[in-house]
Amino acid sequence: MKIGVLGLQGAVREHVRAIEACGAEAVIVKKSEQLEGLDGLVLPGGESTTXRRLIDRYGLXEPLKQFAAAGKPXFGTCAGLILLAKRIVGYDEPHLGLXDITVERNSFGRQRESFEAELSIKGVGDGFVGVFIRAPHIVEAGDGVDVLATYNDRIVAARQGQFLGCSFHPELTDDHRLXQYFLNXVKEAKXASSLK
């Protein structure tokens, strides 16, 4: 199984390490042709407007949308969650606009720039330490969206079919259960596409 990590900014190496720890091959993606042959893609954290500028500069917006349209799974963490969202509070336009969620940027407030919180994640388990760094949260989830985790009544992880997103940085701990959950989804999508 081959998983891409969008390598424009953010904790790219940490995601590669997590994917490899789960037994899959990781490929750092900086050009659209590198999307070919991938089974899934991780959109790492960082700063969402910077990532969007780089996506535009490298001509990746359409290829990323086509990758998703082909039924390939995508996992957005922190700023990557913002890239996935169809709606962003305070912005007219989404970035990739793939998942039926509304996201608010830096929504835990400046004084809580970074913190850790123990989460219970549906399908993953309890005692998962979420590392939040200038984190967004999901303000609203559409009907087809499965809420996987909340923190202080805010949605911090959700899944809609092939799209998985979380507010925190799962790659910054040695708990790879969420990466494994994503890889399981990739495996399911791969089996489904081979049956078509």
From Swiss-Prot:
Its EC number is 4.3.3.6, 3.5.1.2. It comes from Geobacillus stearothermophilus. Pathway: Cofactor biosynthesis; pyridoxal 5'-phosphate biosynthesis. Coiled coil: none annotated. Catalyzes the hydrolysis of glutamine to glutamate and ammonia as part of the biosynthesis of pyridoxal 5'-phosphate. The resulting ammonia molecule is channeled to the active site of PdxS. L-glutamine binds at residues 46-48, 105, 133-134. Keywords: Glutamine amidotransferase, Hydrolase, Lyase, Pyridoxal phosphate. It holds the Pfam family SNO. The active site is at 78 (nucleophile), 169 (charge relay system), 171 (charge relay system). This is Pyridoxal 5'-phosphate synthase subunit PdxT. It catalyses: aldehydo-D-ribose 5-phosphate + D-glyceraldehyde 3-phosphate + L-glutamine = pyridoxal 5'-phosphate + L-glutamate + phosphate + 3 H2O + H(+); L-glutamine + H2O = L-glutamate + NH4(+). InterPro entries: Class_I_gatase-like, PdxT/SNO, PdxT/SNO_CS. It comes from the Bacteria. In the presence of PdxS, forms a dodecamer of heterodimers. Only shows activity in the heterodimer. GO terms for biological process: glutamine catabolic process; pyridoxal phosphate biosynthetic process; pyridoxine metabolic process. SUPFAM superfamilies: Class I glutamine amidotransferase-like (SSF52317). Belongs to the glutaminase PdxT/SNO family. GO terms for cellular component: cytosol; glutaminase complex. GO terms for molecular function: glutaminase activity; pyridoxal 5'-phosphate synthase (glutamine hydrolysing) activity.
